[in-house]
């Protein structure tokens, strides 16, 4: 499953990032978004969602959220 299907307020663990874009992968890594890290969807709008990673909150678009694969 990916972040677009995650429930708000529930903590998940990042399984992998599905992207061929090295720049995007490096950007996510700089946020602390990589395999094994906990992540929580704080809120969701139509085109974006706010996630919590390592006590920081980030607003990401749905295309980026689809690339972040998670598990419970």
Locate each region found by the language model.
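A structural micro-motif recognizing beta-strand termini
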Residues: 17-19, 30
């Amino acid at each position: 499953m990916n972040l677009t299907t995650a429930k708000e307020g529930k903590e998940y663990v990042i399984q992998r990032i599905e992207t061929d874009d090295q720049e995007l992968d490096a950007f996510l890594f700089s946020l602390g978004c990589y395999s094994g890290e906990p992540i929580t969807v704080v809120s969701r709008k139509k085109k974006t969602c706010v996630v919590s990673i390592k006590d920081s909150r980030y607003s990401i678009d749905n295309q980026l959220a689809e690339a972040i694969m998670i598990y419970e």
